[in-house]
């Protein structure tokens, strides 16, 4: 690590402002998966053992940024947090203003305070419009710790601007350190070979940077999901009514040419599950890509032959990175391809298997294989940006490590 870590701080009896990522899925006021809260506990517990007063700040969802919205309140997080800590955690009704300042002032060493959703204020996502937002957050702590790997690819106030107010006193949390070291060592600097990356999801354009970066790293690149259909169309295949990013077709051709130059094998679906609509109980069938998808049908998942081919390549790999589902996993049976990949990764215990957060992490959790994968990242977009650039905006602004 070339940045200061939380273990190098002296937080005793001081207030520590900690950016966590508690952006958890919530339904009817209940948290569906608390992995992000669980993942932050080592840093929180470490600071409490050091007798620090811990001020947690996070966003949740995408509120309008015009004030409190009940459905985006961090209130459901409090109960889970209290369960892990074993003591009461107050939730400040706001993250700035007099109520927040009072809550911070009353916080004792060895206790935790959670500030309300940062994104209730426009200044979080648009710091240039309201510089006072970052300035007020900065005033709460003696030290700053970033443990929100999943948000550190964004130049938001709490991630990018606040730490700059703590020269020599801003550090990476334990989760952040673990993410950067694992991804850096096993994917960027010295991956065991053969190295295979599997990319799903909808758009080529949003992943073009990481695709081009991976082409200088991997031996095999498996492409599926909506992105796969864009590549298939670029090769002149008939993809029917499947999701295609028309503006990405030229990008796909560029990638195919670059892969050839770099001797990287790109593998696309050879068959797909097709249906007239993506809805539960719909009639579906499997179609070979070479036979073409009929105009009134859309591809919604990879087919049996593609599953077999993808799993064969995974089994022969020493390092595997997966980001993005290969089908519409929320609607069975179009979850079969993604589930098969999750199970294949779990079985392949001799390889280093890395799941790049987001929907792929959700699939692995649904398949019950999270513990059998080498590393499930807490950041989808962040893991991709780290692979693309080798750094994240939110880590670059932390204090340099001391020699």
Curated annotation (Swiss-Prot):
Its EC number is 2.7.2.3. It is found in: Cytoplasm. Gene3D superfamilies: Phosphoglycerate kinase, N-terminal domain. The keyword Transferase applies. SUPFAM superfamilies: Phosphoglycerate kinase. ATP binds at residues 207, 299, 330, 357-360. Keywords: ATP-binding, Cytoplasm, Glycolysis, Kinase, Nucleotide-binding, Transferase. GO terms for cellular component: cytosol. GO terms for biological process: gluconeogenesis; glycolytic process. Substrate binds at residues 21-23, 36, 59-62, 119, 154. The keyword NAD does not apply. One of its GO terms (molecular function) is phosphoglycerate kinase activity. Its main location: cytoplasm. This is Phosphoglycerate kinase. The lineage of its organism: Bacteria, Pseudomonadati, Chlamydiota, Chlamydiia, Chlamydiales.
């Amino acid at each position: 690590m070339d940045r200061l870590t939380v273990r190098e701080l002296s937080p005793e009896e001081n207030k520590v402002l900690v950016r966590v990522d508690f952006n958890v899925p919530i339904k009817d006021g209940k948290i569906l998966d608390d992995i992000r809260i669980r993942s932050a506990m080592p840093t929180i517990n470490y600071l409490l053992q050091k007798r620090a007063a811990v001020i947690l700040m996070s966003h949740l969802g995408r509120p309008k940024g015009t004030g409190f919205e009940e459905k985006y309140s961090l209130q459901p997080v409090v109960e889970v947090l209290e369960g892990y800590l074993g003591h009461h955690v107050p939730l400040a009704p706001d993250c700035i203003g007099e109520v927040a300042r009072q809550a911070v002032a009353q916080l004792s060493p060895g206790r935790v305070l959670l500030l309300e959703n940062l994104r209730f204020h426009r200044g979080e996502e648009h710091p240039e419009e309201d510089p006072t937002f970052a300035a007020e957050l900065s005033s709460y702590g003696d030290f700053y710790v970033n443990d929100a790997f999943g948000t550190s690819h964004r130049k938001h106030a709490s991630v990018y601007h606040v730490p700059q107010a703590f020269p020599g006193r801003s550090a990476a949390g334990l989760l952040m350190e673990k993410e950067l070291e694992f991804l850096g060592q096993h994917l960027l600097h010295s991956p065991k070979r053969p190295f295979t990356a599997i990319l799903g999801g909808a758009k080529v354009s949003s992943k073009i940077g990481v695709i081009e970066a991976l082409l200088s790293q991997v031996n095999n690149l498996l492409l599926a999901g909506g992105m796969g259909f864009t590549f298939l169309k670029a090769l002149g295949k008939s993809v029917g009514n499947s999701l295609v990013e028309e503006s990405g077709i030229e990008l796909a051709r560029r990638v195919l040419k670059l892969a050839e130059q770099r001797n990287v094998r790109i593998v696309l679906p050879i068959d797909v599950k097709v249906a007239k609509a993506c809805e539960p109980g719909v009639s579906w069938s499997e179609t070979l890509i070479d036979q073409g998808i009929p105009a009134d049908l859309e591809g919604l998942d990879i087919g049996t032959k593609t599953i077999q081919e993808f799993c064969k390549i995974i089994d022969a790999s020493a390092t595997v990175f997966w980001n993005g589902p290969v089908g519409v996993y929320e609607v069975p049976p179009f979850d079969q391809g993604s589930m098969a990949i999750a199970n294949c990764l779990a079985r392949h215990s001799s390889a280093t298997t890395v799941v790049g957060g987001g929907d792929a992490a959700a699939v692995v959790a649904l398949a019950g294989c999270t513990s059998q994968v080498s590393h499930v990242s807490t950041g989808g977009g962040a893991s991709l940006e780290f692979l693309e650039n080798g750094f994240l905006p939110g880590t670059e602004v932390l204090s340099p490590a001391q020699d």
